[in-house]
Amino acid sequence: MELTTRTLSAQKHIALVAHDHCKDMLMKWVARHQALLAQHVLYATGTTGNLVSRATGLEVNAMLSGPMGGDQQVGALISEGKIDVLIFFWDPLNAVPHDPDVKALLRLATVWNIPVATNVSTADFIIQSPHFNQPLDILIPDYPRYLAERLK
């Protein structure tokens, strides 16, 4: 597949997602980085977004709850180039009914080459990166070219 460049702006669009057993961990992480996160545009699945907003006062664009389609909504935003970073604290020790949605979300984040954090350590690496508050060019699939090839 051919690639093209997408520029992530200095103000990132960040999706926050957390499974039930990980919500408290994400809430503590957001609270520690609240001042920095306030400079960016936040999205989240429904329950997580409402909890973050209520606890911190941060403006969060909340989707539906994950099991009700929120993971897929976030995935669609990633595919549309509207999400720059995914912070997804998932629980590897407990299965969730919407596991296929979780796998699809992680697959789309990989396809569209956005940074993904799946735990506190990787989230800290991302937020402390010198690229976090700067524009950054990433390589993504060249979808128009892909479609043109498929339609030959």
Swiss-Prot record:
GO terms for biological process: methylglyoxal biosynthetic process. It catalyses: dihydroxyacetone phosphate = methylglyoxal + phosphate. The lineage of its organism: Bacteria, Pseudomonadati, Pseudomonadota, Gammaproteobacteria, Enterobacterales. It is an enzyme of class 4 (lyase). Belongs to the methylglyoxal synthase family. This is Methylglyoxal synthase. Substrate binds at H19, K23, T45, G46, T47, T48, S65, G66, H98. Residues 1-152 form the MGS-like domain. GO terms for molecular function: methylglyoxal synthase activity. NCBIfam families: MGSA (TIGR00160), PRK05234.1 (NF003559). One of its GO terms (cellular component) is cytosol. It comes from the Bacteria. The active site is at D71 (proton donor/acceptor). Catalyzes the formation of methylglyoxal from dihydroxyacetone phosphate.
